């Protein structure tokens, strides 16, 4: 039930019309009886917003339901009075409240008029007459109650008259500040003679924004002096609030007026300057800027034609139009492209080699390729664009190599990542028809570098995505094709851009997820992980000095013992790259910096030099993160050690086999350890091959008769896949069958066929590094990988005994020398 000013009476409900007719008839009957005798029993209608006060005329919306039924009951009786009482809680449901949820004091009201509304509800015009108090509830269904009426004391004292004058004075002040009810107030004040202070108090508080609880308190106050005193307090609060609101409005209007005045003055000043020739209009400024730009560039004719057309178009547009902004932005991009500007290349091999060696340790094959690139550029009087893809684990220096290449060639460097990119518009730009459209990353690279032959690094190309917006990998096909990228077309510019002189460097962790057509356009250079000796050199020559400089320290403040760095590498940073190692070095230096500052504040200079040793390293880094890579110092029966290769570098892979009685009575094999489909097939091949060649390796031995063999690959939470564990699985099964342990410190890798041939695999360098880390000094590699092994540096192969095999017979002789 809500009060409202809506008087729309269209689409009248027939039942409501009938109620109105009956009420008119009952009104006539009631007037004939006694207009001055109020009924002692009233139907009560709950209110939940604000209470009404005597002397008011107010509309009330009656919704379909029990309250509408009350109207019908009143229409059938000789009475047209109802009671209006406020609920105790504002959020109470007025259709479902009981007497215990209502205040005891309310008002009686006479129904003057009903205006039916579509949907079974009606708007009722009420005349509020007297205060009432609920004496005794009669029924709960329609909230009918026995009520008593409060009669006002008509005695007018001098004090009440003074109160009335104060109230009228405040109301007049309110009129000046808030003219919303000006007409109604003037009518009321014109008829007010101060002889009815109670009515004046009720009317005045009804005008305020007081809370429902404050208004209900006024309604329940029957003593005239107390009521008019409380009304005066509420009016003064309302006056203070209106003054504050008026002050805020005046400040806002003053600010707006000042801003408008400044705007008009600036516009007048601008117009005067233009008339005097002291200032140019926006058209002239923009056109002059664009002319100045492309006059400094060697713009191709096809681009010049587009620029000229757009400049002619810009002159015809109003500066305030949306099309002007679109055209200006388009010209801004067209003229900011460094047409014909190329940086001068340097082809000094000695200087290039010096820079590469200074920035990076090892990576000889990568450095060799860069020097070849420089040599070709020197002989050909200019270097055409190349596409190089650096593949390797995280933290091995792929991004920093890209920066070094740009430094060696004296070119600008721009890097962006396509990891997770799903919209081809990021590469080729958005159409100009879209709001906020802009060119793709490649044109942005040209803008930022301001040359047409920068080094652009496209990072994480193996993690590129696709969606309904397009396939960014397919968009890169045109970019990375030397035969096509000379005419690269960005969707936003819609003008051909020559990218043939750009040197593209891409980085990836693995090649498996890169589409073959894209992979075919790249020259792949692999960066393997680092061994202990390499990490030690990198930490000593690069990471520690750089971190010390960042922390504001020097070699006089802190030094690392080589054994401490080795301990850190083996126990805290056992990864393919050096990113975690670098973070650990910085962590140590931060703690050292804290101690130095604390000592300085305590004036203790004697402990300003710190040496990091294996013994005190744990004080800085906490407990070691890694234990030994080896699960077994001495290999038990049924266990063979393989070598694996992942996107994070090389790792050891243990294959464990155990034999249990079979419930089916047949020989059976079961594989666990998050093995992928290819590895599952390798286990089946190993099982079948061993079964077929059993007499060769274990003559007279039954093949796991009435047993189930369980093969497990530890670290079961890590997914594993690939064919290179074939010979390792056969060796594990043979060890279990013969009850003979595999040769200790032996690691192996190789794909097995059903006939026992051992095929080549990938990641020889990574697997060799993993073997050195796990202290496996006897290795078995396929014969097909001998050439890969021979190309490795001597320090990697030092101390290792490597056997190359073509058939599993060779593996058997090495793994089980005593059989």
Curated annotation (Swiss-Prot):
ATP-binding in keyword set: yes
MF-aspect GO terms: ATP binding; ATP hydrolysis activity; ATP-dependent peptidase activity; sequence-specific DNA binding; serine-type endopeptidase activity
Binding, ATP: 392-399
Name of the molecule in the record: Lon protease
Organism in which the protein naturally occurs: Chlamydia trachomatis serovar D (strain ATCC VR-885 / DSM 19411 / UW-3/Cx)
InterPro entries: AAA+_ATPase, ATPase_AAA_core, Lon_bac, Lon_bac/euk-typ, Lon_lid, Lon_proteolytic, Lon_Prtase, Lon_prtase_N
Keywords tagged on the record: ATP-binding, Cytoplasm, Hydrolase, Nucleotide-binding, Protease, Serine protease, Stress response
Similarity section: Belongs to the peptidase S16 family.
Biased composition (Polar residues): 1-14
Lineage: Bacteria, Pseudomonadati, Chlamydiota, Chlamydiia, Chlamydiales
PANTHER family assigned to the protein according to its UniProt record, in alphabetical order: LON PROTEASE, LON PROTEASE HOMOLOG, MITOCHONDRIAL
Subcellular location(s) of the protein: Cytoplasm
HAMAP family to which the protein is assigned, alphabetical: lon_bact
GO biological process: cellular response to heat; protein quality control for misfolded or incompletely synthesized proteins
